[in-house]
Amino acid sequence: MRFLEVTENKKQYLDLLLLADEQEDMVDRYLDNGKMYVLDDNGVKCECVITDKENDILEIKNIATVPEYQGQGYARALIEFIVNNYREQYAILQVGTGDSPLTIPFYEKCGFVRSYIISNFFTDNYDHPIYESGIQLVDMVYLQRTI
């Protein structure tokens, strides 16, 4: 298993990025300014884009695993890689996600706790309704973890 920083042609992973953020113009808002990493285990299995938020906060803007490899620990391994490589520079790792029964428990298992909510984020910022597990995402839930 290798963790590789992607510095050029990040859009080659667009299909994977769109699994976590299904509107391309929203991905474009952070892709160029963010640092991108992929987890390669006999092929790319997972990607993550992080940005410098402010005040010692590093934010996961996008993390996604190839569907057939989900549930095998790749995203968790990539999060731990980020934590281990950025703990000297940042105090907090933060992630914003929809209030979904799939994503919230995953992040909580990775040591994140709920921090705050941005009401109506998905309805105000996306040009179409976003659904996960049959539930329309409305609010953005931010979770944080000390690193």
Give a label for each model feature.
Residues Q94-G96, E108, V113-G134:
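Conserved catalytic-core motifs of GNAT/GCN5-like acyltransferases
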Residues G34-M36, L137-Y142:
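Short hydrophobic/aromatic beta-strand or adjacent loop that forms the aromatic wall/cage
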Residues N85-D99:
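Conserved GNAT acetyl-CoA-binding A-motif
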Residues D56, A91, V113:
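Short acidic/polar active-site loop segments enriched in Thr and Asp
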Residues L4-P67, I79:
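Acetyl-CoA-dependent GNAT
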Residues M1-N9, V141, I147:
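Conserved N-terminal entry element of GNAT/NAT acetyltransferase domains
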Residues Y69-F81:
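Conserved acetyl-CoA pyrophosphate-binding loop and the N-cap/start of the following alpha-helix
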